[in-house]
């Protein structure tokens, strides 16, 4: 889908660049496939802010998206493509031959009327699901499982994909968008194709109010605060902080590694950080 620009009638319109969503379904989602969504405003169960700069925004309905695709060898027809406010990608409503419906992540080049299927050996075409070990090397994939049967976790955002670049005994090697190469078990499943809405990265918010509609509050810098609020706060006039960048709680930021899941390090063949050096 193409990008839309607008006549510069206001500064916000001048800067605004949106994805053209005119080809998407304009009605309401299937009620049986939705849930109510409570807005947390960045607060946890004790009412304290755990994620800063969140709150407000338009009320959203949660669409239940099928990331597992575990109806094996049951063809489904794409009924329509829909907008989903909870994610950057578009979703597709599919209907199985037994009459059940489901939402799936819409890949690029998936159209209304297309047939998709999940199985051990299926055609290599967008929207089909199969175990990674049965895919040909070089296949572009998304919605990739990391644990067998858990459902897709990798490459689910708009325009993202990974590539299957090799095999190693029971495992396959996939290359992610970040440049990281990692081992995933061959019985884990993935969906063929790249995720829809690749133009999302080229959009421009246009004005501050549009961020508020999305539930994002203004992000204040530490150096503009008082000393009570941030380690970088205070000083006469504008200052540069006077120390290496830290979080509001005094921990180093901007580059300090925070990954602690050492048990899965053995599956990372090429770190995304090594590539950048």
Swiss-Prot record:
Subunit structure and binding partners: Part of the 50S ribosomal subunit. Forms a bridge to the 30S subunit in the 70S ribosome.
NCBIfam families reported for this sequence: rplB_bact (TIGR01171)
Superkingdom classification of source: Bacteria
Recorded name of the encoding gene: rplB
Record's compositionally biased regions (Basic residues): 209-220
Pfam families in UniProt: Ribosomal_L2, Ribosomal_L2_C
Source species: Bradyrhizobium diazoefficiens (strain JCM 10833 / BCRC 13528 / IAM 13628 / NBRC 14792 / USDA 110)
Keyword annotations from UniProtKB, A to Z: Ribonucleoprotein, Ribosomal protein, RNA-binding, rRNA-binding
GO molecular function: RNA binding; rRNA binding; structural constituent of ribosome; transferase activity
Region named Disordered: 199-277
InterPro entries associated with the record: NA-bd_OB-fold, Rib_uL2_dom2, Ribosomal_uL2, Ribosomal_uL2_bac/org-type, Ribosomal_uL2_C, Ribosomal_uL2_CS, Ribosomal_uL2_dom3, Ribosomal_uL2_RNA-bd_dom
GO terms under cellular component: cytosolic large ribosomal subunit
GO biological process: cytoplasmic translation
Function in brief: One of the primary rRNA binding proteins. Required for association of the 30S and 50S subunits to form the 70S ribosome, for tRNA binding and peptide bond formation. It has been suggested to have peptidyltransferase activity; this is somewhat controversial. Makes several contacts with the 16S rRNA in the 70S ribosome.
Family: Belongs to the universal ribosomal protein uL2 family.
Protein name: Large ribosomal subunit protein uL2
């Amino acid at each position: 889908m193409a990008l839309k620009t607008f006549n510069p009638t206001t500064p916000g319109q001048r800067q605004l660049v949106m994805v053209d969503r005119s080809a998407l379904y304009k009605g309401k989602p299937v009620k049986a496939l939705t849930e109510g969504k409570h807005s947390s405003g960045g607060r946890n169960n004790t009412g304290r802010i755990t994620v800063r700069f969140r709150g407000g925004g338009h009320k959203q309905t949660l669409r239940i998206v099928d990331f597992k695709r575990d109806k094996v060898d049951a063809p489904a027809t794409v009924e329509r493509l829909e907008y989903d406010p909870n994610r950057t990608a578009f979703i597709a409503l599919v209907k199985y031959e037994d009459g059940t419906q489901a939402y799936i992540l819409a890949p690029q080049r998936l159209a209304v009327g297309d047939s998709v299927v999940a199985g051990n050996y299926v055609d290599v075409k967008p929207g089909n699901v199969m175990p990674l070990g049965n895919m040909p090397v070089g296949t572009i994939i998304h919605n990739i499982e990391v644990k067998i049967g858990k459902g897709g976790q990798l490459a689910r955002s708009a325009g993202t994909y990974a590539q299957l670049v090799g095999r190693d005994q029971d495992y396959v090697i996939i290359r992610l968008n970040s440049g990281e190469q990692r081992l995933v078990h061959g019985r884990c499943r993935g969906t063929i194709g790249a995720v829809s809405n690749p133009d999302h990265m080229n959009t421009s918010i246009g004005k501050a109010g549009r961020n508020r509609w999305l539930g994002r509050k203004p992000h204040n810098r530490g150096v503009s605060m008082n000393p009570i609020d941030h380690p970088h706060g205070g000083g006469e006039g504008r200052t540069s902080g006077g120390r290496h960048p830290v979080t509001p709680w005094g921990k180093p930021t901007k580059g300090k590694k925070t990954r602690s899941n050492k048990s899965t390090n053995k599956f990372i063949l090429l770190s995304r950080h090594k590539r950048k050096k």
